[in-house]
A protein has these predicted regions:
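Acidic active-site catalytic centers that drive phospho-/nucleotidyl reactions
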Residues: 10-12, 107, 131, 154
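Non-transmembrane alpha-helical segments in soluble domains
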Residues: 71-72, 89, 112, 159, ...
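Conserved non-catalytic scaffold segment of RNase H-like nuclease domains
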Residues: 2-7, 12-101
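Substrate-recognition/cap helix-loop segment adjacent to the acidic, metal-dependent catalytic center
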Residues: 92, 105-126
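Short, polar/flexible loop-turn hinges at active-site or ligand-entry regions and domain interfaces
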Residues: 70-74, 118-124, 145
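Acidic, Mg2+-coordinating catalytic module of metal-dependent nucleases/exonucleases
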Residues: 95-104, 109-110, 140-168
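Short, flexible loop segments at boundaries between secondary-structure elements
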Residues: 123-142
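Short, function-defining helix-loop hinge/capping sites that tune catalysis or transport
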Residues: 18-20, 115, 162
């Protein structure tokens, strides 16, 4: 695997469905085994709902049980879904590079669902999608415990784990 350039993405959502409403996107660019850039944006959940994305009452309840800091983090300066996806696409670029999520059926799948809901071009190829959780399970690795639920903090922790694994 060419490890020179990778993107790790983490989302905070209002559902666990594949077409979940996204409330924040955090991403980290890893180049030559170092974090070289980050991306973070909060998304207006109403615009996700308007785009047909799913909101789950159980997930809303779960968020209500999280810390005030976690709840407030994704409510600060949210932008419409279209703007968030546009900005993420500009940040990611048009060149398909490996993109990692923490779960084979979560972050990248949900992000792709948002692209499709907006009828937008997905900038990565399906073969560039990888699952960090699967890799960690095979290698018996664990992320540091965190209840932060901040997309950028989580993406950074995951990127650091990816770097550790790729260096070993």
């Amino acid at each position: 695997m060419d490890t020179t350039k990778q993107v790790v993405v983490d989302l905070e959502t209002l559902s666990t469905h594949a077409n979940a409403c996204i409330v924040s996107i955090g991403a980290v660019l890893v180049e030559d085994m170092e974090i070289t850039d980050t991306f973070y944006i909060n998304v207006d959940g109403r615009t996700c709902k308007e785009a047909g994305l799913h909101i789950d009452p159980d997930t809303i309840k779960w968020w209500g049980e999280q810390s005030k800091e976690a709840q407030q983090a994704w409510q600060q300066n949210p932008v419409p879904l279209q703007e968030a996806i546009d900005k993420f696409t500009i940040w990611y670029g048009r060149e398909s590079i490996p993109i990692w999520g923490y779960g084979a059926n979560f972050d990248v799948v949900i992000l792709e669902s948002a692209y499709r809901a907006l009828d937008m071009f997905i900038p990565w190829k399906f073969w560039d999608i990888s699952c960090l959780r699967t890799l960690m399970n095979v290698l018996d690795k664990r992320l540091p415990k965190s209840n932060n639920h901040n997309a950028l903090d989580d993406a950074t922790a995951q990127a650091n784990m990816l770097i550790e694994i790729l260096k070993s």
